UniProtKB/Swiss-Prot annotation:
InterPro entries: SBP, Sperm_putr-bd. One of its GO terms (cellular component) is ATP-binding cassette (ABC) transporter complex, substrate-binding subunit-containing. Transport is feedback inhibited by intracellular polyamines. Keywords: Disulfide bond, Periplasm, Signal, Transport. Coiled coil: none annotated. It is found in: Periplasm. This is Putrescine-binding periplasmic protein PotF.
Amino acid sequence: MTALNKKWLSGLVAGALMAVSVGTLAAEQKTLHIYNWSDYIAPDTVANFEKETGIKVVYDVFDSNEVLEGKLMAGSTGFDLVVPSASFLERQLTAGVFQPLDKSKLPEWKNLDPELLKLVAKHDPDNKFAMPYMWATTGIGYNVDKVKAVLGENAPVDSWDLILKPENLEKLKSCGVSFLDAPEEVFATVLNYLGKDPNSTKADDYTGPATDLLLKLRPNIRYFHSSQYINDLANGDICVAIGWAGDVWQASNRAKEAKNGVNVSFSIPKEGAMAFFDVFAMPADAKNKDEAYQFLNYLLRPDVVAHISDHVFYANANKAATPLVSAEVRENPGIYPPADVRAKLFTLKVQDPKIDRVRTRAWTKVKSGK
């Protein structure tokens, strides 16, 4: 064989080996698809997981249970893990969109708070399909200085009167008001405020007093959205919002970091408020199950989930993590409510589809103002 042929052959072999090597690496690249709420994980959680495991995470976000439910019910989600609220998970279970979790692959499950597991089990019997992640309340986020400037030093910031009493909201309109785009939660909040069952099974409660009040409030509501209010509160663009505790505290923290002089706080009203639990679940069509279990175990580590709580300002469901959560978060009664406040909290129950339809139509009417 000539030197030229030898050179040509060695180059061919080297090229073939390189191609095989690249192909092998591509074949070995593991991927995980996650669909979570916006602003609901620490900035470095996914990157740290990727670095530790070599798994590539494709991470997408949503800002309402309705958006997630639409994708789940349509089938072929393409996601390996999703994060519904427990009350939504309950009705999705009847549609068979999730697969049971194999607890033998979740050795760190023991770190979860038994009391929270019992509460979530009301929606997911025996905690068969879902792993609790974070929990919080739906309350009032407000700009302390602007609200006092409009309503005075004695503004009822500890009451739903602040935002559900028409004469108050009419005055607050000048500095900006937002409501969650979450019909189940807003209607439950209004019904509770009116002294009715927040989980009423009477269609007339939704189409009558609840809708009547919301229509009176509607002209003074700038927008309905479930994430925009975070930055708007932080920047001082709105002064009051029906929002989720962790999101409002994120707004407060962003304002402090920006040193913009905006003072944001959160209130769990004295009349009672809704508590919710968000959970990780695996869609029935999940393709990367092993990778999904690795991520769930990663989140079950106390140090990991405590770090997330410190960034998102939500209480986590991991009892072993509580001592590791910063005092700023752990000792904040708006994030970890004391017993007397917890006693006034309520949760959503799955409703008959007829009530769902009534509520959806009423919500469309409220948002349009007609």
